Structure formats: C-alpha cells, structure tokens
Amino acid sequence: MIMEQNIFNAVYKVNHAGGSGSCFYLKNYDLFVTNYHVVDGFREVALQDNDKNRFYARVVLVNPAKDIAFLKAEGDFSALPEIALSALDSVSIGQKINVAGYPFGMPFTVTEGTVSSPRQLINDSYYIQTDAAVNPGNSGGPMFNDRDELVAITASKITDADNMGFGIPVTALRELLEQIGDLDTSVYNVQCNSCDEFISDEEEYCPSCGDKLPSNVFQERSLTDLAVFCEEAIQAMGINPVLARVGYESWVFHKGSSEIRMFVYQRSYLFCTSPINVLPKKNLEPVLTYLLNAEVKPYQLGLDGNQIYLSYRIHISADNL
C-alpha cells in the first residue's frame, strides 16, 4: 500500500498535563480534529509536529457522544496538505487502511492493516474495526485508505486484545463539519447531541431542548500543587507552560539552545535535567573519571545510555516547595 508521504505532515501530537494523543489538520476549516476523550478536562493544549515544533491550541468544540473535538491553533498551517474525506460508503471488509499517529507518546508512526468490519456496533454507535495496531496515543489520529482519504478517526482498542482497533467513521465528522458555520471559535463550545445546539456557557441541561448534558463536560482538570509550583517557575522564564507540558507532572522546554526536562521520579524527587553531550566512542576513561569526580554542586553530572546530563534534584516536601 503506497501512500503520499506528504499527507502525514498534517498529523500532529496533542500534549497536555494528562498525557498525549494524536490529531490531524483540516485545511478547509483551519481546525485540528481529535477525540473528545483525548482532551477531556482541558481547554488549552500543545500541538507538536514531526519536527517537534510546538503550537498553542484551544479546544473550541466538543461532542462527547461522537467522541470528537475541534482545536484552534495559533500559527500558519497553510503549507500543510489538504486531507480529503472519503465517500460516505467507501469502506469494505478486507480494505487496506493506514493508522497514523503517536502511540504511547512516541515519535510518529504508521501501521497498516485491513478493515475487519465497516460497521461494528458498540454501545449504540457504529465504528470501523481494523486489525491494524492501535495503541494509547493513537487516539484522535487519522485512518487513511489507499487513496490517502480519511475514512475514520482512530478512537480506541479493546484492552488486552491484539489486532482489534476501532475508528469513528468519517460520516460522523462530516455531520459535525456541516453544522459549524456559525461556530464561535473564540470560546469553548459543547454540542448537544440531541438538538445539535452549541453551548458556550456552563449548563447542566441544554437551553434549547432540555436534554441533560454529560457530567463534567465544562469542568477543567486541576493541576497539582507541585505542577502549579513548576509552571509558575516556567512562566517566570518567559515560557508558556502549556507548550512545555508532556504529561502528568512532566515538562520539556528550551532555554536558549538548551533542552530542559522537568519530571517527578518515584513520587519523591523533582528532577531538572539537560542533555549536554554524548560519550565519545573511544578513550572513555578520562570522561568517566571527570563525571565521577567533578564538583558542580548543587548540580550533578550523570549518564543515560551514551547521553551526558546535567541534573538538579530536590526532594518533594512542603518545606522545599
């Protein structure tokens, strides 16, 4: 199955304080598409391309019933390729598809598979079932056919079941796109699944039809005290902490040319590390001797594989924070 590699440039990673997922760009709408469950509890996220460039994005529309969310990002994406949506009934059993995304938060990958069922009924909704490898982090990414057309949004896999992944058919996305002509992308909107009304003010029931809205759909996840402490420090350096988030109590950002990583280790220590060089291939003894004996307090020099790091460690306690 040969695909136009350029199409994958429109697939991005979604990062926030809860983890990561995948998304893709629809050029005609200037919106990124992902799963609702990928951004559930977050209004602000960071999008990352294959070259690790990051872009601030806001969640502007969610439909929990369809498990679809739209993101509006800051930046110029006009150079990205246009993703075409497949015809309504173009998926059949045995058809080849590609699942693109960032499984487990790893670099971009594409896995090939076939359609096991074009209309698999699960919890009153139809999904495309595939035997392609689908893992956490793939959610929100695209499923393409052999004509580079979008056939589904990768949604999930059955836990502990190999070769069984599911995608939201492109028909659900088409329906949503047809309704967003008057969408206010400056605010967060929830779409009522009963009457399709867009609701931007926090409500328990839809003001148009009275249908009960999903619980917590307007609620944002709170950061831990430690995360607030770290993000205040990141903000003080002139860096948007939203762009630095790469998971729960974990951040990666650049200060000048240096990459800095902040993370919690074994719930006991907060580490700040920066990779500074790699070990030489020969004559290691002088370098290793220096790493063992150099006085760089309060910092430490260390190794991870062949990468030399400069680190700072602090025990997590109320007194230290």
Pin down the residues of each PLM region.
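Long, charge-rich boundary regions
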Residues: 217-282
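Conserved active-site neighborhood of the chymotrypsin/trypsin-like protease fold
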Residues: 8-9, 13-20, 27-100, 105-108, ...
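Residue-level recognition of beta-strand microenvironments
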Residues: 60-62, 102, 118, 146, ...
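Short beta->alpha transition motifs characteristic of CBS
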Residues: 35-40, 111, 136, 152-160, ...
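Catalytic nucleophile loop of clan PA
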Residues: 24, 133-154
